[in-house]
Structures are given as C-alpha cells and as structure tokens.
From Swiss-Prot:
<keyword id="KW-0687">Ribonucleoprotein</keyword>
<dbReference type="GO" id="GO:0015935">
    <property type="term" value="C:small ribosomal subunit"/>
</dbReference>
<dbReference type="GO" id="GO:0003735">
    <property type="term" value="F:structural constituent of ribosome"/>
</dbReference>
<dbReference type="InterPro" id="IPR023803">
    <property type="entry name" value="Ribosomal_bS16_dom_sf"/>
</dbReference>
<dbReference type="InterPro" id="IPR000307">
    <property type="entry name" value="Ribosomal_bS16"/>
</dbReference>
<dbReference type="Pfam" id="PF00886">
    <property type="entry name" value="Ribosomal_S16"/>
</dbReference>
<comment type="similarity">
    <text>Belongs to the bacterial ribosomal protein bS16 family.</text>
</comment>
<keyword id="KW-0689">Ribosomal protein</keyword>
<dbReference type="GO" id="GO:0006412">
    <property type="term" value="P:translation"/>
</dbReference>
<dbReference type="GO" id="GO:0005737">
    <property type="term" value="C:cytoplasm"/>
</dbReference>
<protein>
    <recommendedName>
        <fullName>Small ribosomal subunit protein bS16</fullName>
    </recommendedName>
</protein>
Length: 91
C-alpha cells in the first residue's frame, strides 16, 4: 500500500484551512485518512500557521510515507526533514 503525507482541505470558500494527514495514495483528497499529524492555515493574519506533531511525522517518514510537494516544503521549513535525514544517516 502506497502511503502519502498530504493536505486535506477544510474551511469555507476563499478561506482555506488544511489538515496534514497520512492517507493511502489511491484515496481521494478529502477521503479516508490513516492518521492526522498536523494542521496548516495559509490564511493566518501575519504568516502561515503550521502545527505538526514532529514525532508522528518522523515515524511515518521512517515507515516509508512519501510527502507531496507542498507537504515536503512545509516539513523542510519546520526542520523535520533535516532531523529525518540526520537520523537516517546516524545509523
């Protein structure tokens, strides 16, 4: 089963709010999820607001989940991918 870390859209028209979730790659964007690992609010007043459970994100990356391009950018800005690479090369 191919697993992806991706965004599911919530919120109203022109006011998006996203959950960062782990889901089967074949399921629809807002369909069945395996686990929610964070949130992303691009419409925040000052800057985009991101909250991610770092332990869950690292667990799913270690288990082989592939982040989408947007989630990859979010994870790299949060420093989670750097931590993942350090853990991977430390072994």
């Amino acid at each position: 089963m191919a697993v992806k870390i991706r965004l599911t859209r919530l919120g109203s028209k022109r006011n998006p709010f996203y959950r960062i979730v782990v889901a089967d790659a074949r399921s629809p964007r807002d369909g069945r999820i395996i686990e929610q690992i964070g949130t992303y609010n691009p419409a925040s007043v000052n800057a985009p607001e991101v909250k991610i459970d770092e332990e869950l994100a690292l667990k799913w990356l270690k288990d082989g989940a592939k982040p989408t391009d947007t989630v990859h950018n979010i994870l790299s800005k949060q420093g989670i991918l750097k931590t993942f690479d350090e853990q991977k090369h430390a072994k």
